Amino acid sequence: MSDLRFLTFEDLDQIAVEFGTPCFVYDEKTLRANAQAVSQFPNAFGLLPRYAMKSAPTAAILRIFNQEGLGIDASSVFEVERAIRAGYGTEMISLSTQELSDDFRYWAQDGVKVNLCSLNQIHTFGKWKRNERVGLRFNPGMGSGGTNRTNVGGPASSFGIWKDDLRHALDLCKEYGLVVERIHTHIGSGSDPEVWKKVASMSLDLAREFPSVDTLNLGGGYKVARMPDEKATDLQEIGAPVAKLFEEFAEETGRELKLEIEPGTFLLAHACSLVTQVQDVTSTGPEGYRFLKLNAGMTEILRPSLYGAQHPIHIVPEPAQAKFRELTDQVVVGHCCESGDLLTPAPGDPEALLPRSLLRGEIGDFCVIEGTGAYCSSMSAKNYNSFPEAAEALKKLSGTVALMRKRQTFEQIVENEVAP
């Protein structure tokens, strides 16, 4: 049990009895420590970390980060509403969205800071309200990420206004009297300090074209190391040269820009474990594999099936049995009727099975999947095969575990269906 980040067997037993499995369990101590770490990101003239709430939008998490002084990065008007319901003031919320639905008008006039992410969005916003203060999101022409699917910059990404459309964006803002006070860029999920320094420099060049800009948002994408062979982002290492660039920009222009960042994975990944149980075991013979079938899968954690992402997996038998279990190569799969519901793919290749050396699992054992705080509960194949959404719980600073989101009922799955 010493291998688990923050759970004990007693915790697992309590969770299974009180909430059932599968269940996402978040750790308040880790959440608060990570929030305090991002608040120490090097900066020259002021910093506001904004939580990328798409990574895990449950209200209890939002309330913790609000208490820690983090702002909100929302990716839809629906996330804006969830943040407000969780207690956030509109002045602490920034909206950068692929789909600028009509509802943005309501939130924009109520104080939410809107970043316009395309030339069409500038046109749409400008027609609605002239002479307004806005932000612009640009694609600086390069990106960084573990896979193409987590890279949100460069010519293969649709996010943001393409860098070569700068003049067109300037002209549109002038046409509608829009005052650009924020420049936003975001390149993806990487950890190379030189890449961050280069993107910061390119972003400052964009800010130079807008004399009214007082804030530069460099987005998030701070990689965490879920597995032993992965490299995590050192915030101090990537932030120090960026702060120096801000100082040089101030010396050159007389403008002291505030910095915003938008961490999601950094805050959440290691702050949650998915508690599941082995519900079946099967083998395909000496030339095949030993499969552990869980009572969870892509309905809770889609990242392995989508990216070939790797997560630490622990088989946790009753303590009295653990010493009699040997390490065995096993493939861990989910409960969906879908061949791609695979939890141990080859790194970066969701098509390939890769057995993992784990304690030999048996039916009824707990299986704890770690590193599941970000883009798991919020980004899964919800209700596939009509499985209900899993419960979510919080291990509080006191050590007690409390429910923060109920398991979905079958009635809730079908409640919106009507007879045509």
Describe the residue ranges of each PLM region:
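A charged N-terminal "starter" segment
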Residues: 1-132, 156, 171-180, 208, ...
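Active-site loop/helix belt of alpha/beta enzymes
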Residues: 140-282, 387
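Charged (often Lys/Glu-rich) extended helix/loop segments that serve as interaction or gating elements
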Residues: 256-420
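Conserved, mostly hydrophobic/aromatic
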Residues: 31, 54, 76, 107, ...
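General beta-strand structural signal in soluble alpha/beta enzymes
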Residues: 51, 72-75, 95, 115-118, ...
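Active-site-proximal loop/turn and secondary-structure-junction residues that shape catalytic pockets
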Residues: 55-57, 78, 99-101, 118-120, ...
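Short acidic, glycine/serine/threonine-rich loops at helix termini
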Residues: 62, 84-85, 105-108, 126-128, ...
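Glycine-rich, aromatic-flanked loop segments that form ligand/cofactor-binding clefts
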Residues: 129-143
